[in-house]
Amino acid sequence: MIQVPVKDANNQEVRSTELNESVFGREIRADLLGMAVNYQLAKRRLGTATVLGRSDVRGGGKKPYRQKGTGNARQGTIRAPQFRTGGIVFGPQQRDYSHKLNKKVRKLALQTALSVKASSEEMVVVDKLELASIKTKEMKALLSTLGAARSTFLVVKELSNEIVLSARNIPNVMVADVDGVNVYDLLRYEKLVITEEAVRSLEEKLA
């Protein structure tokens, strides 16, 4: 088991807790992390880039001028790609960029990303995360006290309006519940601030 300190809102250690090695103590595998990040980013791509091809451009049903006798190159339609208003050759079309990644691989990649944070001392476990009111200033002060003011992924067991709205306008801070934890955001943000309740929930979900 991995022992980590549990901090309070004043960054004081109140106790220590054990982390499940099957979730937070995995061997670091860059290949799994790369596959998971590519999988996530590919799913986010809209793939809406589209141009009109030769068969999509309006007009051009009539031969623009006679075949012989004009001195011009022979043409059959003004929709041909050599014309200014013609269709585009091999242009981008609407497509789906997402691809499959096995569920076991996704789970192992998430365990690996959590292990990266735990092993590099970029994870701060707090006993609880509560705000009396919706105040961005209070949230900034809390993160600064915990040493996580620059780039933070904040994970709680259940989202509350006070936490979400207080962190919404702080640059480089993202809030998620246990179901929203993912490989890309774990690697993207420098610090992981997570409540002890959320740690237990992740262990139940991923162990």
Curated annotation (Swiss-Prot):
Domain of life of the native organism: Bacteria
InterPro entries to which the protein is assigned, alphabetical: Ribosomal_uL4 (IPR002136), Ribosomal_uL4-like (IPR013005), Ribosomal_uL4_dom_sf (IPR023574)
Gene Ontology process terms (BP): translation
GO CC annotation: ribonucleoprotein complex; ribosome
Gene Ontology terms for molecular function: rRNA binding; structural constituent of ribosome
Pfam families: Ribosomal_L4
Keywords, comma-separated and alphabetical: Ribonucleoprotein, Ribosomal protein, RNA-binding, rRNA-binding
Span list, region Disordered: 54-74
Similarity field: Belongs to the universal ribosomal protein uL4 family.
Function, as annotated: One of the primary rRNA binding proteins, this protein initially binds near the 5'-end of the 23S rRNA. It is important during the early stages of 50S assembly. It makes multiple contacts with different domains of the 23S rRNA in the assembled 50S subunit and ribosome.
Subunit and interaction comment: Part of the 50S ribosomal subunit.
Record PANTHER family: 50S RIBOSOMAL PROTEIN L4, LARGE RIBOSOMAL SUBUNIT PROTEIN UL4M
Name under which the protein is recorded: Large ribosomal subunit protein uL4
Species name: Magnetococcus marinus (strain ATCC BAA-1437 / JCM 17883 / MC-1)
Gene: rplD
